[in-house]
């Protein structure tokens, strides 16, 4: 809980979130038009139904139902056997039919939860998950407004939480956890920059210790977790100042100005009756039987927290590494392919430290990496069988990442194979000791830290290719003579 220090008393935030998650699907919710619209030219992924041409009827995409059921199960929801679609009536240029098809009365899923481990295992209740159409997009340029209907009709899951959140830290954790789960089960890509994971935040404040809910404001269409946090903090503080100054709050719908860092009113908040909801007469109700729910449940992958706990239990990984490896489904798959051939801790270290450092620097995903799981396996093979040293492996990996070449070809091309010939290493050690007689004398007089200096000189002479264990052994032997 975050306490806001007021002039008259302490206040607490009351926050509920409505997340609009775009369903991963080839086609839209009620038409055959493509749902992959982000990079498309305006109005090129549009069917006659999407722009409400007369006589066009909706045809329900069953795959979107499956995706919503899968999401509900992953969030511990009750999947309702009966569900139906309704019309939400309002007028806006990017809504050509004058209504949005949604699920007001009978959502697909209810009564779920998300557990926030970093917030003392706090449970945030999920009120409902329902399917609905996305609207088009209004583009304002040069004093004119254009409408792109590519997005119109794309399937959204609206995931509504109870007002259980009490701080922006909890909000950020909730959104990250929810996004991770949806990505992992393959129902939403969670890309906030592309608008496929958007958030509306309902914010109110009340005196600390009160159980009465205050007048809330709804902040619409927040498309980054950072902006969600900034918007909520600004709005909560604005409400506290207003209340302490004796002002009466009005239920409003707000936008967040990311440049000014403040909220502004776009309209008075509507209630349900303002939208005149009624059942859509063009769509049958849904009967979702228990057998279908069981089949969808069987298709669920191992969820991130379950997978993380298994990594910690079976592979003895620390929580930090395990959390990183399960944060993305593709990363977990990469790790599991490598760990079939190599020690889990060795694999995790190379993926989390070396691979991720380069991926993050370039801002690319693991699927875009030139170093595939098979290449990582080969590199670790070379380390384990002592073909190359760990130090040389770092050089090999850097070249692999830049060129896409296999590790063995790089080792052969650059002559990086580890020097294991005892006689050759012995000659180099003798030369190093002969050139540092004063340090040898100091070592024998008790300055044992110089041992590392001798090792470093030998590795320098061999350009890091000498077997470190062999070097240590021979130096010890020579210093005892």
From Swiss-Prot:
Record-level Gene Ontology MF annotations? asparaginyl-tRNA synthase (glutamine-hydrolyzing) activity; ATP binding; glutaminyl-tRNA synthase (glutamine-hydrolyzing) activity
Report the catalytic activity: L-glutamyl-tRNA(Gln) + L-glutamine + ATP + H2O = L-glutaminyl-tRNA(Gln) + L-glutamate + ADP + phosphate + H(+); L-aspartyl-tRNA(Asn) + L-glutamine + ATP + H2O = L-asparaginyl-tRNA(Asn) + L-glutamate + ADP + phosphate + 2 H(+)
Q: Pfam families attached here? A: GatB_N, GatB_Yqey
What Gene3D superfamilies does UniProt report for this protein, alphabetically?
A: 1.10.10.410, GatB domain, N-terminal subdomain
Q: Which domain of life is it from?
A: Bacteria
| Task performed by this protein | Allows the formation of correctly charged Asn-tRNA(Asn) or Gln-tRNA(Gln) through the transamidation of misacylated Asp-tRNA(Asn) or Glu-tRNA(Gln) in organisms which lack either or both of asparaginyl-tRNA or glutaminyl-tRNA synthetases. The reaction takes place in the presence of glutamine and ATP through an activated phospho-Asp-tRNA(Asn) or phospho-Glu-tRNA(Gln).
Family annotation (NCBIfam families): gatB (TIGR00133), PRK05477.1-2 (NF004012), PRK05477.1-4 (NF004014), PRK05477.1-5 (NF004015)
Q: How does it assemble?
A: Heterotrimer of A, B and C subunits.
State what protein this is by name: Aspartyl/glutamyl-tRNA(Asn/Gln) amidotransferase subunit B
Which organism is this entry from? Ehrlichia ruminantium (strain Welgevonden)
Provide the taxonomic classification.
Bacteria, Pseudomonadati, Pseudomonadota, Alphaproteobacteria, Rickettsiales
Gene symbol of the encoding locus = gatB
């Amino acid at each position: 809980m975050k306490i806001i220090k007021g002039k008259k008393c302490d206040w607490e935030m009351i926050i509920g979130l409505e997340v609009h998650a775009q369903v991963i699907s080839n086609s839209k919710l009620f038409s055959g038009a493509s749902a992959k619209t982000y990079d498309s030219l305006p109005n090129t992924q549009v069917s006659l139904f999407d722009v409400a041409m007369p006589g066009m009827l909706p045809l329900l995409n069953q795959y979107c139902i499956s995706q919503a059921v899968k999401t509900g199960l992953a969030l511990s929801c009750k999947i309702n056997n009966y569900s139906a679609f309704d019309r939400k009536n309002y007028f806006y240029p990017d809504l050509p039919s004058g209504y949005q098809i949604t699920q007001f009365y009978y959502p697909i899923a209810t009564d779920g939860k998300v557990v926030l481990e970093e917030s003392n295992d706090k449970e945030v209740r999920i009120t409902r998950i329902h399917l609905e159409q996305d609207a088009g997009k209004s583009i304002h340029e040069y004093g004119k407004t254009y409408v792109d209907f590519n997005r119109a009709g794309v399937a959204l899951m609206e995931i509504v939480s109870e007002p259980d959140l009490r701080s922006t830290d909890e909000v950020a954790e909730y959104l990250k956890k929810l996004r991770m789960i949806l990505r992992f089960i393959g129902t939403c890509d969670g890309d906030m920059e592309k608008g496929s994971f958007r958030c509306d935040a309902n914010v109110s404040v009340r005196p600390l210790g009160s159980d009465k809910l205050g007048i809330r404001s709804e902040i619409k269409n927040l498309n980054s977790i950072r902006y969600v946090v900034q918007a909520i903090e600004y709005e909560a503080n604005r409400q506290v100042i207003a209340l302490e100054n004796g002002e009466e709050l009005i239920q409003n719908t707000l936008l967040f100005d990311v440049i000014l860092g403040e909220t502004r009113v776009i309209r008075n908040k509507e209630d349900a009756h303002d939208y005149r909801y009624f059942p859509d007469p063009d769509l049958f109700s849904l009967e979702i039987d228990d057998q279908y729910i069981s089949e969808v449940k069987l298709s669920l992958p191992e969820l991130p927290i379950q997978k993380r706990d298994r990594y910690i239990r079976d592979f003895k990984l620390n929580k930090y590494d395990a959390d990183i490896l399960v944060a993305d489904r593709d990363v977990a798959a990469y790790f599991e392919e490598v760990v079939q051939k190599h020690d889990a801790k060795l694999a995790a270290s190379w993926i989390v430290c070396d691979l991720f450092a380069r991926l993050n620097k370039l801002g690319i995903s693991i699927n875009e990496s030139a170093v595939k799981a098979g290449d990582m396996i080969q590199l670790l093979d070379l380390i384990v069988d002592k073909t190359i040293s760990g130090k040389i492996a770092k050089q090999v990996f850097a070249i692999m990442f830049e060129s896409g070449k296999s590790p063995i070809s790089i080792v052969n091309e650059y002559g990086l194979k580890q020097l294991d010939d005892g006689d050759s290493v012995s000659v180099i050690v003798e030369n190093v000791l002969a050139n540092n007689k004063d340090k040898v004398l100091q070592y024998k007089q008790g300055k044992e830290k110089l041992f590392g200096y001798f090792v470093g000189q030998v590795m320098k002479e061999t350009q890091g290719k000498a077997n470190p264990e062999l070097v240590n052994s021979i130096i010890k032997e020579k210093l005892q003579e």
